[in-house]
A protein has these predicted regions:
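Short linear motifs at secondary-structure transitions and domain/linker junctions
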Residues: 1-2, 21-25, 84-87, 101-104, ...
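Conserved interdomain linker/interface between the two RecA-like ATPase lobes of SF2 helicase motors
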Residues: 1-53
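A short helix-to-beta-strand connector/capping loop
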Residues: 16-21, 68-70, 105, 162
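C-terminal helicase lobe and adjacent C-terminal extensions/tails of nucleic-acid helicase motors
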Residues: 34-46, 54-89, 93, 98-99, ...
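Structural motif
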Residues: 47-49, 108-110, 127
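Conserved two-lobed SF2 helicase motor
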Residues: 101-116
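Flexible glycine/serine/alanine-rich "lid" or loop that lines and gates the nucleotide-sugar donor pocket
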Residues: 120
């Protein structure tokens, strides 16, 4: 900046963060499992980033069942805050910047996108489900993040591990994919990343180049997927067109709802703001804060009774489509439920109160209703997090 004339001055990237990442692909469960087995046998640590919570749970349960000797942990966003903090501490101890060989060796983490955010984690091996290119680049930042020797101990000199390799769990490659190319192998994710053409372009770019250099390749990678001149295969064109139309509609909504800074705080903007209105700051699936309570010995208490913020420690975020209101409960007196609800932040107005009873399987369960008013039983434990009945039954089926 010179006086009142702005200018741009490029800064050199630090040598410690400039690197080449090799990319390979695994188009089956068995291929991913083999890479994890190789990591364990060589005394390395690994992470598999999955695109949905159910997919992460499924991988965690199957791997634990098939390899009981492995040291595996599960990390996603659907844990009560106290449990999530405990998991974060374990994850940082095993994979954080100060972790050593003894803490890292043979450890495996199955996670969702939560590992991309704020935590300083460093894995020897990294596997990710196929995602848009910008997320792939971001996730790769957790691979060989710090300089280490061949055993995984921190060092100051050049990293002594093999070249960082990012494995992408993906559909089988096709030059001419059908509309089912991504939907069939990843049925839970098809509505998370709706533009399947962009996913195909991401895979094509990385296949063609065999990897990428950062930061040199960043612009070419982004433009190679999001550029307007890129050609989408006919089989994926419709899904891409619909996704892009939806994104344009969301952009229009955002434009109409932006604040007019020149008018100050008035009610003349596109959307009137009331004293207690819900004012979301982003578009997307709405989420709800769920306040967990446990019924023990005739008392209803926060699930994690840890003053002074017991209710906050007992809260978990979940999609409103899955849980929108408290369901009927015949075992806990209504007056006790109402009295407990009064203790919640804002008396529970902006969330769902979920009293839980311990089931015969030692998992906590409670009744709720989804966004359409359909009743459901929800389940919670500190290992798997909060589950709908469908998710829980699927989990139990895998464990049998």
């Amino acid at each position: 900046y010179r006086g009142d004339v702005p200018g741009e001055y490029p800064l050199e990237t630090r040598p410690t963060v400039r690197r080449h990442v090799r990319v390979d692909f695994a188009d089956s469960w068995q291929a991913v499992e083999q890479r994890l087995a190789d990591s364990v046998s060589s005394g390395q640590c690994a992470c598999w980033i999955r695109n949905t919570v159910p997919d992460a749970r499924e991988a965690y349960s199957q791997l634990k069942d098939q390899h009981p000797e492995w040291k595996i942990d599960l990390f996603h966003a659907r844990f009560a805050l106290a449990d999530r903090f405990a998991i974060e501490q374990r994850v940082l101890e095993r994979f954080g910047s100060t972790s050593n060989h003894e803490q890292r060796a043979g450890q495996i983490l199955i996670a969702t996108q939560v590992v991309e955010q704020s935590l300083d984690l460093d894995f020897d091996q990294l596997i990710t489900d196929l995602a848009p290119i910008d997320l792939i680049i971001q996730r790769a930042g957790r691979l060989h993040r710090h300089r280490r020797d061949v055993q995984g101990n921190r060092i100051e000199e050049k990293d002594q591990r093999l070249e960082p390799t990012l494995t992408i769990h993906s559909p089988t490659w096709s030059d001419d994919p059908t509309a089912e190319w991504f939907k069939t192998p990843f049925p839970r994710v098809q509505t998370v990343y709706e533009d399947h053409g962009q996913l195909w372009l991401t895979m094509k770019l990385l296949r063609d180049h065999g990897g990428f250099r950062m930061p040199e390749d960043a612009r070419d990678l982004i433009e190679g997927v999001y550029g307007t001149e890129n050609e989408i295969p006919d089989g994926l064109w419709r899904a891409s067109a619909e996704a892009q139309g939806e994104n344009k509609a969301k952009a229009s909504i955002a434009f109409l709802n932006q604040l007019n800074l020149d008018s100050g705080y008035t009610t003349l903007d596109a959307a009137n703001w009331w004293d207690e209105a819900k004012t979301p700051t982003r578009l997307g699936e709405e989420s709800t804060t769920v306040w967990l309570a446990r019924w023990v010995n005739g008392e209803l208490k926060p699930f994690h009774d840890l003053p002074p913020f017991a209710w906050q420690q007992s809260s978990v975020a979940m999609r409103t489509a899955l849980i929108a209101e408290t369901g009927p409960n015949s075992e806990i007196p209504e007056e006790i439920i109402n009295t407990c609800r009064e203790q919640l932040p804002a008396k529970g107005k902006w969330g769902v109160f979920l009293p839980l009873l311990k089931s015969q399987s030692s998992v906590w369960q409670g009744n709720a209703k989804d966004k359409n008013g359909n009743p459901d039983t929800l389940y919670y434990d500190a290992e798997q997090g909060l589950m709908t009945s469908k998710e829980y039954n699927l989990q139990e089926g895998q464990n049998q």
